[in-house]
Amino acid sequence: MYEKIWNQNKIAFGGDYNPEQWDEATWEDDMRLFRLAHIDTVTLNVFSWAMLQPDESTYDFTKLDRIMELVKKNGLKVVLATSTGAHPAWMAHRYPEILRTEFNGMKRKFGGRHNSCPNSPVYRMYSARLAEKLAEHYKDYDNIVAWHISNEYGGECYCENCEKAFRVWLKKKYHTIEEVNRVWDTAFWGHTFYDWEEIVLPNLLSEHFAYERTMFQGISLDYRRFNSDSILECYRLEYEAVKRHTPDIPVTTNLMGFYKPLDYQKWAKYMDMVSWDNYPSNQDTPAQIALSHELMRGIGGGKPFLLMEQTPSVTNWLPYNALKRPGVMRLWSYQAVAHGADSVMFFQMRRSIGACEKYHGAIIDHVGNENTRVFREAAALGAELKALGDETLGARARKEAAILFDWDNWWAIEYSAGPSVLLKYRDEIQNYYTALYKQNMATDIIGVEDDFSDYRVIIAPVLYMVKPGVDEKIKAFVQAGGIFVTTFFSGYVDDHDLVVTGGYPGKLRDLLGIWVEESDALPEGETNHFTWKGARHEAVLLCDLLHLEGAEVLATYEEDFYAGMPVLTKKRYGAGAAYYVAVRSDALFYEALIREICEKAGITPVAQTPGGVEAVLRVGRDEKKEFLFLLNHEKIEQSVPVEQDATDLVTGMEWKKGSKLTLPAYGVAILKRSV
């Protein structure tokens, strides 16, 4: 049996509600509109710190009390935020030390958000105190279903507080200055430190010549880790504060998908449930959106997550803020549910009238009534989710194929001085995920600390950094019969970004049965080629020049001085096999490779669908039923063969094996069937 992640009897539907921005007459009309839209859950108090605490010693919850009672009276559940995402002006005025210093050394003044130094003792004290006051005040309010700590944690600070805290962090991690010198390789350029006070933080005033370009990768990598840990400590202080008074209410904070500055795999260990905000750009493909959902599900150990925010239609920060076409909001909401969401929440309930988010989408527009396209679409979706009830809550995905993703690896790759400015870790992950996605292969995104034994295939694109013990885990996985795939620029460094000497790919050399002698970085537009399985494919970005040490050649380069050298290899290892892909290639190659390795591993698509129809399978809480989500991302209707007797939970229609189910443009079906 699988458990629900929170105390809800349906997929929660609602989102960020900011009544403090409006008069109380508007509140009453909001309640009417919420009923029409089938809203059942609201996130309150996200940015109310200045209202709740007008000075150092005064806490005034009077208005929030009225709001909390109003939503309770109207049958709404509450996700209660702690309001610490933006500090009040009086605090910045009285304690300027709480203000962040930017990467270029510029000290901030009051304004914006993400504006507090995470290592300011004053900020930490006041934020934790507010969280505790809120929890103590509302501990007997029985309508809170979750705590929402701060909001979209992020950013970095480079102030004196942070520099001092960085030295403390280094002492705890490395113990001696000699070890710091070793792991940072400070003999290079005469950077040897003899005293902790000599260490300065890395920014544009010291080791960096651009935000992502550093002269000492080890220093910059550790500062990234330190910054993520520092902000995590702020979250944990508030987590502990609310748990002291409300131990049974789950606690989360809204993450942001592939957000580079924070190591969410580490953060998720301290979250009762993962939640995140999904704001794809106009150019993002369905596979890119799906990958972000998979990452968020993955960091939570495969449990369902909360979709805490999405826009009902437009965002406000893109160069061109296009409308979501009719049906797309519904489609993307169900896509989130298919990949593990147990909520469908929006920012925002009512569109604000001032500042930078006044043109961000909302359920209730500036016209202030229900007579808008967006409201009608939201209300229709709300009715469907109400009818769906608790059917899909707590459902899980089957474990078959996985892609390894690691934040430290991400940071290290893109801090690297070479081999190519075009090398982006997320792009390489996406290439392999898209090939799995297009073939409807069940895929998890896992970290290097996760259990590998449940999977048949593990793909680790650009596993540049091999942390201690990870090579042994991979070897054990393959030895036991697993199929492992990795690529160019893998196995080069340890967890300090120090090169593993003795030949690339370092500790993976024996497993892969190859030695990479050198690597050719191709400028944009320059292409080599190789032929595999009768099809000719591109070789771009990086071309590894490798020698065989027990592997077999599956394909070779066709051009340049390394024509005839291996580009794709395979080595049998124990009961399994390890593949090495020496280049970035084209979509058809990735699809062919995925098809071959999944066939060898006995992994089959969850459904056969035409192009543009996504199929996702989840197993119900009782493990006796499963749900096949069919999502048509195309502007035309498409038909899907029904492979097993099923009931469509969206329409209520019964479908027999062998029949054809027609999905309209942007249409959705959820086929419930026996396992």
Task: Identify the function of each model-found stretch.
Residues 9-11, 38-40, 72-78, 140-145, ...:
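Short, well-ordered coil/turn segments that N-cap beta-strands
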Residues 29-35, 43-106, 238-245:
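Aromatic-lined substrate-binding rim segments of carbohydrate-active enzymes
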Residues 199-203, 248, 257, 268, ...:
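Carbohydrate-binding surfaces of carbohydrate-active enzymes
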